[in-house]
Amino acid sequence: MPLKHYLLLLVGCQAWGAGLAYHGCPSECTCSRASQVECTGARIVAVPTPLPWNAMSLQILNTHITELNESPFLNISALIALRIEKNELSRITPGAFRNLGSLRYLSLANNKLQVLPIGLFQGLDSLESLLLSSNQLLQIQPAHFSQCSNLKELQLHGNHLEYIPDGAFDHLVGLTKLNLGKNSLTHISPRVFQHLGNLQVLRLYENRLTDIPMGTFDGLVNLQELALQQNQIGLLSPGLFHNNHNLQRLYLSNNHISQLPPSVFMQLPQLNRLTLFGNSLKELSPGIFGPMPNLRELWLYDNHISSLPDNVFSNLRQLQVLILSRNQISFISPGAFNGLTELRELSLHTNALQDLDGNVFRMLANLQNISLQNNRLRQLPGNIFANVNGLMAIQLQNNQLENLPLGIFDHLGKLCELRLYDNPWRCDSDILPLRNWLLLNQPRLGTDTVPVCFSPANVRGQSLIIINVNVAVPSVHVPEVPSYPETPWYPDTPSYPDTTSVSSTTELTSPVEDYTDLTTIQVTDDRSVWGMTQAQSGLAIAAIVIGIVALACSLAACVGCCCCKKRSQAVLMQMKAPNEC
């Protein structure tokens, strides 16, 4: 048989097979060769028929179906996944899911269900995931789930539940994920979860819970995530989590917690994320956190904390992110951050800090980003960053800084982001070392806002980087010499140097210091080959050399910079919600 005949036969067989696959597909639906059926559209008001007998996945979405009658899926017993979402569904007849013994996934989310018939899920012996979220359910009863012994995931969030009766989940011994968030729960019985020994994720966020009784979580020995944020909890019982040794993520943010019992976090060796932001905490006592050797993130912003004592975080040896912004912190003890040798991100912005001890950050050898903006800092010790050699980003904007110590940033070779704007900089002769360092490291300041002078009044509003500072010199008679050329402004660059920049105190002499020295030396009439005095020639040469070096540094920053500018997604927050719905 010629080759073209084989090809025609092959095409014909494929077309015939495709016709079989699509046989029985309703006109309102689309059916694929992979036994997947999707029925969507407002024109659909009832379950389309006939459905393909071999369908394994059926989706009915965005229709005007208001009820499911008995046995609409009787002829598709091989169905494994059924999604009936975003419809007008308000009533389901018992027996609607009859003959679906192979069904493993059932979603009735985003409908208008208020009541679940008893026995609705009878016969669904293989069901593993049941999604009832975003409906209008008013109550659940133990009989609703008594036939779902294989269930692993139950989603009930986004309903109108006010109470969970004892025994509601007693038959769900294999359940690993339970979501009860976004309801109207005001109270949880200490016995409601006692048979859920395999549960790994429990979410109770965005309810109206005011307290959690002792023993509520005692039976949840395998729990890994507990979400209690956005409730009205005012007090935590000391032993509330003492039996949850496998807990990894604990969300307690946006409640009314005003104090933490001394032993509340003592039995959580696996915890790696703890959120307490948006509460009413006023103080943190030493040892309150720990021992938690695996904690990586601690979120404490938006509280009323006023001070940080010594060793308050000393048990958190692996902590990498510490967020203390938007509190009322006015004092930090020199040993407050003892033990935080692995910390990468420290946020202290928007507090009431006026002064910092020179040793307060000495233990933070691995710190990369520090946020100190929106405080009242008047000065910084010269050794404030002495042991923090890996800093990449420093936020100091919107403080009360008038100057900074000589060489404060010289050793920070990895620094790629420095924010100094919105400070009342005093642009007199004392500002020259800082001005010269900024001139040589201008790309690190960013392109949005640069620091400007606040005083004296005659230079207010002028850029600190390009300002000409009049240096007072001894009163001696000197011939007229050209004024020192204005420091050139170099274009900003999005890149940042990845090696230590030349500072004003090391390899390059301060240009204004040269100017001062030259004007105090007795000047002769000897002229150079350019027709200048020696002082004029030296001044011109110094200006040219400094300009070339500054330009070279700026160009090197443009070409060679690959400094990491990574910013923790926790500080930008945003101050956004830390766990999924």
From Swiss-Prot:
The keyword Signal applies. Residues 1-21 form the signal peptide. The chain crosses the membrane at residues 539-559. One of its GO terms (biological process) is receptor-mediated virion attachment to host cell. It is found in: Cell membrane. Induction: In fiboblasts, expression is strongly induced by TGFB1. In chodrocytes, expression is induced by IL1B. (Microbial infection) In alveolar cells and fibroblasts, expression is induced by Sars-CoV-2 infection. Residues 499-509 have a biased composition (Low complexity). Residues 489-509 are annotated as: Disordered. Keywords: Cell membrane, Glycoprotein, Leucine-rich repeat, Membrane, Repeat, Signal, Transmembrane, Transmembrane helix. Residues 560-581 are cytoplasmic. Residues 423-475 form the LRRCT domain. Expressed in brain and placenta. Expressed in lung fibroblasts. Expressed in chodrocytes. GO terms for molecular function: collagen binding; fibronectin binding; laminin binding; protein sequestering activity. SMART domains: LRR_BAC, LRR_SD22, LRR_TYP, LRRCT. Residues 22-538 are extracellular. InterPro entries: Cys-rich_flank_reg_C, Dev_Immune_Receptor, Leu-rich_rpt, Leu-rich_rpt_typical-subtyp, LRR_dom_sf. GO terms for cellular component: apical plasma membrane; extracellular exosome; extracellular matrix; extracellular space; plasma membrane. LRR repeats lie at residues 54-75, 78-99, 102-123, 126-147, 150-171, 174-195, 198-219, 222-243, 246-267, 270-291, 294-315, 318-339, 342-363, 366-387, 390-411. It is a single-pass type I membrane protein. Glycans are attached at N75, N369. (Microbial infection) Modulates the ability of SARS-CoV-2 to infect host cells through interaction with the spike protein. Does not act as a SARS-CoV-2 entry receptor but sequesters virions and antagonizes in trans SARS-CoV-2 infection of ACE2(+) cells when expressed on nearby cells. (Microbial infection) Interacts with human coronavirus SARS-CoV-2 spike protein (via RBD domain); the interaction is direct and sequesters virions at the cell surface. This is Leucine-rich repeat-containing protein 15.
